[in-house]
Structure formats: C-alpha cells, structure tokens
Amino acid sequence: MTSHPVFIDLSLDEQVQELRKYFKKLGAEISSEKSNKGVEDDLHKIIGVCDVCFKDGEPSQIDGILNSIVSIMITIPLDRGENIVLAYCEKMTKAPNQPLGKVCLQSLWRLFNNLDTASPLRYHVYYHLVQVAKQCEQVLEVFTGVDQLKTQFANCPPSSEQMQKLYRLLHDVTKDTNMELSSKVMIELLGTYTADNACVAREDAMKCIVTALADPNTFLLDPLLALKPVRFLEGDLIHDLLSIFVSDKLPSYVQFYEDHKEFVNSQGLNHEQNMKKMRLLTFMQLAESNPEMTFDTLTKELQITEDEVEPFVIQVLKTKLVRARLDQANRKVHISSTMHRTFGAPQWEQLRDLLQAWKENLSSVRDGLTNVSSAQLDLARTQKLIH
C-alpha cells in the first residue's frame, strides 16, 4: 500500500478551529472554540467525535478530514502522544462499511509511515491497521510476510509479548485466505517463546500444528518438532498426529483417524484433505528409496485404485516436490529426485557426500583441461621450431 506524506497549508491553530467547526456542524457534541489547555486537548475532543463524519460524508471528503487530524497528531511529542494515537486508532476500527474502511485503512497507513521509525507508537498503529485491513479485505496490502514485518520495526523492535499478540492477530486474519502465510506466522510466533515460558504456549502450539497440517502447500513439517512449545505437547494426541505427518505413512494416519475420529474433527481438520496430503507424503517417502515403483505398489501403499494412479502422479508432479516419469506401458513410475520429508543428520551427510563428489569431478575436469592446454602449447612450440 502506498502512502503519501502529510502536508497541510494551514497552521495547527487554524486546522483545529476548522475541524471543530466541521464536526459541530455535523451535530457532534463539541465546541467550535479552541481549548485553552492546548492542542493536545483539542485533539482528544476532535478524535472523540471524529466518527460522526462516517454517517453521511463522502469517502474523499472524509479522507481529507482524517488527513488533517493525522497532520496534527504527528506534531505531538512522543511522551504525550500515546493516548491520542490509541484513541484515533480505536476510532478507525469503527468504519461502518467497506468503502469507509478503506479510507480509515489509508489514514492509519499514512499515520504509520509519518511517525518516526524509532517510535514505539508505530506498533500500536500497525496492530489496528491489520484489524482494519481484515474488515475491508486488504490484509495483503499491509502484510506480505514475516521478513517485511521485521524490517518495518527494525529501528524499534516491539517486545516479545507485543509480537506474540501481533502474530496471533496476523494468524487470525490470514488463516482463511492464505494458509501458507498463516502457517509461517504461527511458526514465527512459537519461535518467540523460550525454554522458560514455552510451557504456557500450549494453545499457540496446537494452533500452529493444526494450521500447518491443514495447509495444502506445507509438506516439510519436521521443523515443528524442534520448536520448544511443540515439545511440551509430547504425549498429546496433537503431537502424535504431527509425528505421523512428519515421518509415518498413510496406514498410520488411517489407524489414528479410526481411533481418534472425534479429536481430528474437533480440531477443524478435514479427513479427506488429510488423506490427500498423507498420500503425497507417503509417495515422497517411497520415492526416497525406490528409483522406480510399480502401479501395484502404489495402489497398495496409497490405498487407491489402479485408475487413480496416473492422475495422482500427475498431481504430485505439479507440486514439484518429486521429479518423475510415468511409464504406462510397463505400469511403472521412474523417480528422478524427491524432496525429503525430514532433513536430519543422514540428509546432511548425503548432501556433504554429493558436494564432495561434485568437487572431485570439477577438479578432474580442471586437471584434464590443464593437461589439454599444456599439450596444445607444447605442440604449438614444436611446430614453430620446425618452421
């Protein structure tokens, strides 16, 4: 979302006077005269009635009024501005419809970008900004990822408690429209806990696991097991279910579902979607150790019919998690490569061996080219001596 700098030609006193007159004309309970207590008291009273303009005003006109209020707010010293900013943010969440919600969103974004980057007030503005963005379906305009979020607060990082609150909100506003982003937010949330307070993050840990399992684009689930709050769930059904998705095959999930059907459903997880994901994960695991698989093997391991094998493999190839070739004539699937479901010490050793082999091959090529080059130089010198 773009934001324009705030520039108002009138003096602060003139702006305050005009705003008071405007809101009084709309029927707000406010005096048209300036406060003798100063501009901060004026702002408190103006902000207290500013939502009156939501009733009948045009969005473009309201945007101008809110812009004027913001231009005054950003002049207030930090130590005296917190209550004013919080009151304004709260008013911006009261927009009665989506068009006005977008106006309020733009106003908060303008305020956020005109505050000093080292101001702790930016956190509070951004939190309300996300709330308003949800109301008018503009979340991705203000939040595109965790890295972008951290960059915005680089000069004044919020406390761990504040970030936990913000991550929970971001999870809530993205879970229905972007599960992959929502899952990343929850993983980041769990990363804010330490060994000392991980035990109190039970609810967050469960949400994180459920979000990751439900996300159709999240397949590498092994890192979740290393998160401290997730470790505290060991022995719980949700941890057992996660472990199945991390390293077990489809039959293990089927058995778990038969034994704990009510639990799975109570978590908001869709059994058919779980089956679809577990089939793909099972196929990946089989591909790690089998360069070729018969259709018979796949029908047995994936619990599908032979007619479903080809469509299934095509769907797997679309994910780009596995590179393979269908051999319909011989009823086989030839595997070229696959992403590992888990990436532990064995995988690091395999990667090390692969890189070492590449290094040795490159050294052999270099030595060969050096020998060829030397031979050509010797030949050239010999021919020169002959002539």
UniProtKB/Swiss-Prot annotation:
Location of this chain's protein in the cell: Cytoplasm; Golgi apparatus
Function: Component of the eukaryotic translation initiation factor 3 (eIF-3) complex, which is involved in protein synthesis of a specialized repertoire of mRNAs and, together with other initiation factors, stimulates binding of mRNA and methionyl-tRNAi to the 40S ribosome. The eIF-3 complex specifically targets and initiates translation of a subset of mRNAs involved in cell proliferation.
Annotated GO MF terms: caspase binding; cysteine-type endopeptidase activator activity; translation initiation factor activity
The organism's place on the tree of life at top rank: Eukaryota
Pfam families cross-referenced by the UniProt entry: eIF3m_C_helix, PCI
InterPro entries, per the entry: ARM-type_fold, COPS7/eIF3m, eIF3m, eIF3m_C_helix, PCI_dom, WH_DNA-bd_sf
Subunit field text: Component of the eukaryotic translation initiation factor 3 (eIF-3) complex. The eIF-3 complex interacts with pix.
Residue span(s) of domain PCI: 181-340
Major place of residence: cytoplasm
UniProt name for this protein: Eukaryotic translation initiation factor 3 subunit M
Organism: Drosophila persimilis
Keywords in alphabetical order: Cytoplasm, Golgi apparatus, Initiation factor, Protein biosynthesis
GO process terms (BP): formation of cytoplasmic translation initiation complex; Golgi organization; protein secretion; sperm individualization
PANTHER family with a match to the protein in the record: COP9 SIGNALOSOME COMPLEX SUBUNIT 7/DENDRITIC CELL PROTEIN GA17, EUKARYOTIC TRANSLATION INITIATION FACTOR 3 SUBUNIT M
An example Gene Ontology CC term for this record: eukaryotic 43S preinitiation complex
Assigned protein family: Belongs to the eIF-3 subunit M family.
